[in-house]
Swiss-Prot record:
Keyword match Transcription: no
Predominant place of localization: host cell
Cellular component, GO annotation: host cell cytoplasmic vesicle; host cell nucleus
Listed name of the protein: Protein C
InterPro entries cross-referenced by the UniProt entry: Paramyxovir_NSC
Pfam families named among the record's database cross-references: Paramyxo_NS_C
Gene field: P/V/C
Domain of life: Viruses
Region (Disordered), start-end ranges: 1-45
Originating organism: Measles virus (strain Yamagata-1)
UniProtKB keywords: Host cytoplasmic vesicle, Host nucleus
C-alpha cells in the first residue's frame, strides 16, 4: 500500500495513518534512525525565560494601586456621609450665610476624587480664592485637605494629583496658624 492512499479528507492528501520520517529523507538500503540509535548526547533545548518588562510591572502596580485608591475613596465617601449626618444643625444659624465646614469640604473633595480622580493645586487655589473673605472657611478647607491627605494611604497619594502629596508631610494647618498668630501678636 502506498503512502499516498486515498482517504476521506481528500483524495490527493496522504493517509493520516502513514508516518513520515522527520528531517532527512530515507534512502533505499538505509535504516531509519530512532532516538535510541543516535550517537552522542541528546540535544538540549534552551529554556526560555519569561521576561516581564519593568514598564509592564509598573503598569500592573499602578493598576493595582488605582483599584485600592477607588476602594479607599468609596470608604471615605461612606464615612463622610455618616459624619455629615452626625453634624448638628444648630451649628448653622438661619441668619448666618451658609458656610462650608471641614466635613463639607471633605465631602466635596472626595466627590471630586471619585469623579475625576484628581485633586490639583490649581483646584485648591481656586477654592481658596472663593473662600478668601471668610477666614474660618479658608481654615476649614485647609484642614479638610490635610485630613484627607493623611487618610489616604501614602503609596496611593501619587495617583490623586499634586495637592495631597504636598500636604501629606506638613503639620496640621490650624497649628501653623496659631503659631503664626502668636508670633505676630507678640
Amino acid at each position: 500500500m502506498s503512502k499516498t492512499d486515498w482517504n476521506a479528507s481528500g483524495p490527493s492528501r496522504p493517509s493520516p495513518s502513514a508516518h513520515w520520517p522527520s528531517g532527512k529523507l530515507w534512502q533505499h538500503g538505509q535504516k531509519y534512525q530512532t532516538t535510541q540509535d543516535r550517537s552522542g548526547p541528546p540535544t538540549r533545548r534552551r529554556r526560555q525565560a519569561v521576561r516581564v518588562s519593568a514598564n509592564h510591572a509598573s503598569q500592573q502596580l499602578d493598576q493595582l494601586k488605582a483599584v485600592h485608591l477607588a476602594s479607599a475613596v468609596r470608604d471615605l465617601e461612606r464615612a463622610m456621609t455618616t459624619l455629615k449626618l452626625w453634624e448638628s444643625p444648630q451649628e448653622i444659624s438661619r441668619h448666618q450665610a451658609l458656610g462650608y465646614s471641614v466635613i463639607m469640604f471633605m465631602i466635596t473633595a472626595v466627590k471630586r476624587l471619585r469623579e475625576s480622580k484628581m485633586l490639583t493645586l490649581s483646584w485648591f487655589n481656586q477654592a481658596l480664592m472663593v473662600t478668601a473673605p471668610s477666614q474660618k472657611e479658608t481654615m476649614n478647607l485647609k484642614t479638610a485637605m490635610w485630613i484627607l491627605a493623611n487618610l489616604i494611604p501614602r503609596d496611593m497619594l501619587s495617583l490623586t494629583g499634586d495637592l495631597l502629596p504636598s500636604l501629606w508631610g506638613s503639620g496640621l494647618p490650624m497649628l501653623k496658624l496659631q503659631k503664626e498668630g502668636r508670633s505676630t501678636s507678640s
